[in-house]
Amino acid sequence: VRHGVALVAALLTGLLAATPAPAAPRIAIIIDDLGYSRPAGEAVIALPAPVTCAVIPETPHGRRLGRQAAEAGKEVMIHLPMATLDARALDPGALHEGMSEAQIGAVLDRAQTLLPEARGLNNHMGSALTAEAAPMTRLMDQLRRRHLFFVDSRTNAATLAERSAHRAGLPAGRRDVFLDNRRDLAHINEQFNQLLRLARRRGHAIAIGHPYPETLDYLRQVLPLMEQAGVEVVPVSRLLAPPAASVGAAPRPPGAALTSNP
């Protein structure tokens, strides 16, 4: 605990010493993989900031947590399982290679029935599917009809998902930083600092984390410090580029690297 307090104190000192940005930098934090554990999901919902809750639909507690998150004023996303390069087993309700647009639509119908509060979608795993043009085009066409936004988790550096979303006319964005691909406090602190550096440099940045005890303990300590540090925490939908802004845009530099989240 002392080590954690020292890290947070050092973080705050660094933030306050930084040159103020012309406008408050904005960060969004998506917490993925909600639905397996009710206590972990409720701990995410209780975090002292508008984090975005990404819920896997076909999980034991997904439906309840989606409702609770919306009631608490948290933004809800569908965290949809998608095919991976290593062909690992997927949760029910996943998107697989070779699905027709009608089949993809049926998966989304079920997901929206379970999570009617969801305003958008991001990929759970998906290192194979997000790199294929045809299924991404089919998916984004379906999301457009449903007025859902899309965030690319970037589990494959060759992903086509964000570009496909913009071509389909969706508000879309991408993950810049994974907070907790290593579950230790020092690494999470390092990644959070990277998030803040990106936000200060370009005005905004998006992070993805998970409902791990280490991540939640860290966020409970650091999120209340953001206002004093001049950083605004917002739902991810507020950071998404409109379609015309990013078609053909160059990739963002930092934060786009592949990590161990297939």
Predicted feature residues:
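A cross-domain feature marking catalytic cores of carbohydrate-active enzymes
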Residues: I31-D33, C53-P57, I78-M82, N123-M125, ...
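Catalytic domains of cell-wall/extracellular-matrix polysaccharide-remodeling enzymes
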Residues: S100-N193, R200, H204, H210-E227, ...
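C-terminal accessory extensions appended to soluble enzyme cores
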Residues: V231-P262
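Positively charged n-region of N-terminal signal peptides that target proteins for export
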Residues: V1-G4
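Substrate-binding cleft of extracellular glycoside hydrolase catalytic domains
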Residues: A69-E117
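Active-site beta->alpha N-cap acidic-glycine motif
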Residues: A23-A89
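Bacterial Sec-dependent signal peptides at the C-terminal "C-region" and cleavage site
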Residues: L15-A24
